[in-house]
Amino acid sequence: ADYAKNQENLFLLPEIAISSRGEVGSVLLFSKIPLKEISSVGLPSDSATSVKLLKFLLGERKLSPEYIEMGPDLDTMLEKCDSCLLIGDRALDASRKFPDLVKLDLGLEWKRVTGKPMVFGVFAARRDSSIDKIKSAHKALRDQLKKFEEDDNHRKEVIKVSSVKSSQPEKRLETYFGEVINRVDPEDMSGLRLFLKSACGMESEPSLAW
């Protein structure tokens, strides 16, 4: 969503992004009541993409609740609203701690509605940046991704460190890193184009750095 807003000044780096091809696990709508009955949604202020996606998906369900921006705390949000959107570690924590709440996984719902992967994050650079520096950074990212994909010991160490930093169980993070895709293909890019057009109102094609 931020890319769509600043598209004239940015281009996308190819091959890498943050995508899901079904469940994403870390972008969730939580509700005290059935989704078809919700009238208010608490929104965090830290993810424009997830907010745009949620509004699009609820619109596809013919729902038009009141949206209220507030701090990303589940208890506070559900005191004031029927439902709330959480992302990242907060979503993973809440899913584990409150299994009885109604949950909507936005990656899975996007897949159900469109049949496409959902790209939650992109790697972008300013159009006036040095192309050599961009290519160098892009190569470093791809090298790290390749190591994570192919080196089991490195992967386990990354998951272990991530578990300590996030307080998420290693087993859950192992699952999470399977739900989130970083090496994207043409189908992921097709999903990105659809999201930018349908949820963000971006009519032009996204521009790649090369």
Regions from the PLM with identified roles:
Residues 1-31:
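Glycine/small-residue-rich interface belts in oligomeric ring/scaffold proteins
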Residues 9-17, 65, 99-105:
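Active-site regions of enzymes building and remodeling cell-envelope glycoconjugates
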Residues 18-21, 32-34, 43-50, 115, ...:
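Short coil/turn segments
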Residues 70-159:
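Pocket-lining segment of extracytoplasmic ligand-binding domains
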Residues 129-198:
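Secondary-structure end/capping motifs
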Residues 5-9, 52-53, 95-96:
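Short glycine-/acidic-enriched loop or helix-start segments at secondary-structure transitions
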Residues 25-82, 87-89, 190:
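Bilobed "Venus flytrap"/periplasmic-binding protein-like clamshell domains
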Residues 202-210:
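Conserved C-terminal helix/tail region of periplasmic/extracytoplasmic solute-binding proteins
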